[in-house]
């Protein structure tokens, strides 16, 4: 995780000799997420602001002087709320201040007690654009019809698009030769689609082949299931294998009594099925619960998902040892796991949740080792729509993340004409960003 969160440079705090203002910042009683950290919010001069001094309580180091600098420390990131009672007041505003944030002008106010507050909107403006959520989970397949049959016949997903990418587009974005056929499937709940893609050039390998559960990259996709035992019988009868048979437990993170199992779909794609004790639907499956990514540590995930993609870390805690070891692939070991969740803006609808797993055992990047890449069977990318691809790529570059493909224009059925590129994100894992033309 980068040490510098943001800096009010030497041009900072050039006071605008404004007349003293009587209004004091008033607590809203609400918590905001600023680059993965919860902070109490206040209203001041019609703006939502955060107090500079409060940041030190959440892992920030604050230096006051002719230049106000705020950096993030190595303090453990948690999802505990920031304390603030609605209606509480800070000291009165002394003057409006002109400051710079990442080289851009922002609104700040100095207070009578020497503290300062910064407009939250300005802080987010120089954060990343808050991306909505996962639009596409891109899954390589050795047999498109077999993969399509699995998700349509067994999981009752709907085909919403079918098409072929020309050889030039495939070469530019994926680095593969020849055309590629694809099918997009989704349920009636989530806005996230699965994009099943079969390249003309195939390796015969799968993305997770030869790797451990704790190696970095895409882990699985989890679904809420109506009858796990019935699905276990159905899929084993169809020739599919399981990482673990159905078992029951009570989650330590939500308190729900559930049953769970993990099936290996076409090309070995792990498909987790979760059954709550009370159901609210009659179909085989309901929503796509989450898409899981393994990282080297939670700070790396925050650096990518929050600092670059603008998303909020809303949960971060250890998983009770032994509770779901068989699902996590660590049964019989002393390996422990930390789990986190990220939310986007969900402007595109109910996008699936992003779940992060941080194992105590060091791993390797499946992408950098040639596993989770185009041409192999399995999940190799997630795609996110952005309103400004240029700005997003500049932010990736600023945080040390490089493009992993040519930038190209293509048309995807159900999506439209897009400007798109692959980026090597956290631990080298591939992400596809695109902007509608």
Kindly label every feature range from the protein language model.
Residues 128-141, 145-154, 158-198, 212, ...:
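An N-terminus-focused feature that recognizes amino-terminal "leader" regions
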Residues 9-16:
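Bacterial N-terminal signal peptides
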Residues 65-75, 162-169, 318-321:
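Acidic helix-start/capping segments at beta-turn-to-alpha-helix junctions
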Residues 305, 355-408:
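Intrinsically disordered, low-complexity segments enriched in Gly and acidic/Ser/Thr residues
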Residues 49-59, 145-158, 231-237, 297-313, ...:
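Amphipathic alpha-helical segments
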Residues 2-8, 21-125:
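Primary recognition of N-terminal secretory signal peptides and signal-anchoring hydrophobic helices
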Residues 57, 74-80, 125, 192, ...:
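Short, charged/polar, Gly/Pro-enriched secondary-structure boundary elements
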Residues 115, 124-130, 162, 222-223, ...:
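Vicinal oxygen chelate
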